[in-house]
């Protein structure tokens, strides 16, 4: 993701792994894209050969500003790392960076371009955050690095690099923008703000499990309705299915095993060849106001909860 602490994380990785074990993709023709990636990914468009070369040379990291689906099939989902930043701060910082390093563009034009408002959500391309190895938060960099190191068995050291000297001026709240512009930006960033809030909750969960000395389970509720609840659950490097407990209104409803094949998770190289899904159909459909929750049986980690909407008197 552009302007989300990537430079700091990259430098930490270079220090830990060495330049020879790090590859980068910042796009076609970008001088920071490494030669091997330029040759095999962009020129030959042969990702299979690229993966072979990376494995042969024991490359530790492939990083860059790339939509996740581009390289996700090459690596286990539990080894994929992304960082998100507060959407307005990312937008303002990215615009300032583009104006410094490339052709300056008015803010009103920039926010409508592909690299403008909502770029973080677009680069993730609807991939569930809970399926990734680590989703860090720029504003919580130290906590994110702690989770990253613990999850992947690393010892990366914190770096603070590539900061705009006028960073404080960029961290303006939304209401300081001109009224018409503020409304427009608010609408463009609505989905990304929800994604950012979700990523923060996920980081909270990871920290809680880390502090408790408990293993973290990747997982989430993907769908819930009056008739059924479904989702996925898995652990990194684990081949046996995760056992789950489903509750309805705080009472046990069912014990589940996450064994069902999910094509989307298979494409992401989730453990168990993507056989990590669960589904439960309610014998008695949920009623308005009913709540359900799914937790990991072994640790009590909450994977998700949902409440059946209550219709107002004016709704049909």
Residue ranges and their predicted role:
Residues 1-228, 250, 314-316:
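Membrane-interface amphipathic segments in extracytoplasmic regions
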Residues 202-316:
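Basic, ligand-binding patches in group-transfer machinery
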């Amino acid at each position: 993701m552009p302007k989300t602490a990537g430079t700091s994380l990259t430098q930490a990785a270079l220090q830990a792994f060495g330049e020879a074990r790090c590859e980068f993709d910042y796009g076609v023709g970008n001088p920071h894209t490494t030669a091997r990636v330029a040759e095999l990914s962009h020129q030959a468009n042969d990702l299979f050969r690229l993966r072979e070369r990376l494995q042969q040379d024991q490359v530790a990291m492939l990083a860059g500003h790339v939509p996740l689906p581009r390289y996700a099939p090459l690596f286990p989902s539990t080894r994929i790392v992304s960082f998100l930043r507060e959407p307005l701060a990312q937008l303002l910082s990215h615009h300032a960076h583009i104006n410094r390093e490339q052709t300056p563009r008015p803010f009103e034009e920039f926010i409508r371009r592909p690299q403008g408002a909502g770029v973080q959500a677009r680069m993730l391309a609807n991939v569930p955050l809970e399926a990734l190895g680590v989703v860090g938060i720029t504003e919580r960099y130290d906590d994110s690095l702690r989770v990253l190191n613990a999850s992947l068995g690393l010892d990366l050291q914190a770096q603070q690099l590539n900061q705009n000297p006028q960073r404080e001026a960029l961290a303006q709240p939304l209401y300081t923008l001109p009224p018409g512009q503020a409304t427009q930006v608010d609408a463009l960033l609505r989905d990304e703000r929800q994604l950012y809030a979700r990523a923060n909750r996920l980081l909270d969960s990871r920290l809680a499990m880390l502090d408790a000395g408990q293993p973290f389970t990747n997982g989430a509720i993907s769908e819930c309705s009056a008739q059924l609840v479904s989702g996925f659950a898995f652990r990194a490097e684990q081949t046996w299915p995760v056992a789950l407990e489903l509750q309805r209104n705080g009472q046990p409803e069912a014990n589940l095993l996450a064994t069902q094949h999910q094509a989307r998770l298979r494409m992401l190289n989730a453990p168990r060849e993507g056989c990590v899904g669960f589904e439960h159909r309610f014998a008695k459909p949920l009623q308005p106001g009913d709540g359900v929750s799914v937790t990991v049986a072994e640790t009590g980690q909450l994977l998700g909860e949902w409440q059946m909407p209550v219709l107002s008197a004016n709704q049909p």
